[in-house]
Structures are given as C-alpha cells and as structure tokens.
Amino acid sequence: MSADADITVETEVQPLDLSQRSNDVTISKDGDDWKYTEAAITKTATAATSFNGTIKNTLADGKRMLIDNTAQGVLIFESAKINSTSTAAPALTIENGANVSFSGSLEVKTGNADQYAIRNNGILTITGASTMITSTNTNGSSDKGMDVSAGSVQIHLSKGMYLVKIGEKTYKIVIR
C-alpha cells in the first residue's frame, strides 16, 4: 500500500523581540524580507533570522543596533528601547545607503559623553500618527542626542510632526 501526500507548512514570521537578544543586533533586508543577526557589530555576523518588520521590548544594556545599508522600508517599534549606557559607540546607527521609516515608540540612550544615542548616516523618515522617538545622552556633561552625518538626509518628518529638544541632551519627535 502506498499513499501520496502534499504537506504544506506555513510559519508566521514573528516580531524581533529585543528582550530575547543578548548581543548587538544588525537589521538588514533581503528582497522583501526583514532579517536580523545577533553578534558583535565589529565581528562576522551569524546567520540571519527573518522577522516581520516589528521590533519590541528592551535590548540588553550595553548592546547596540545597526541598521545596515540593505535596509529599505518601514520598521515598526513597539515600546522598543536600546540602552547602550556604557558603550563607546552610538547605541543606534543607520548606515549610509539605508532608507528607513520609523513608526511607533523607540527610546534610545547612551551614557558615553563622547557618543550620540542615534547616528543617522542614511535616510530616515518618521511616520505614523502616534510615533515617538527619543534620543538621549544620559551623561550629565554631554549634549549629544542625535547625529546626522554630512551627506545623509537629515530627517523627513510627515505633516504635523516636529522635533522637540528637551533640556540639553534629549530630543523627541512629536506628532500633532
């Protein structure tokens, strides 16, 4: 006796849960698929894992995120936090060649007086009716929150959005 069977397995691509990551995270795009790798940014990355473009929760303290030059499209942040308080590098870097839109809630902090919380070397667009991006340097002697490198597109803000400076070190993008 024999039987033929077709088996189809569908898997749902999940959000990237930063609370489950214990190392630096690199975000990339392969065709239509968002990918991430978890490894020290300065070392060879491990195999990429797919995620659905949503990033949530808090990355381990002292770890960083890189959005590489293949990244093109919308990233949705669900109460995401990057707290790289002790690292001598930006907590979040957007590489030259990346063209990304941020939506949702993202808080990025650094505690190193010589570093920015966010360094934008690419194109960054802020979208969404309830989006809030916070970029803070928690070191009392620093005024560095966000850096926009020469040659990059600063920040595109949708209608009704504006950048607010709070104190000397914190910047928030507010949508009205």
Segments from the language model and where they lie:
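A composition-driven surface/loop motif
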Residues: 7-176
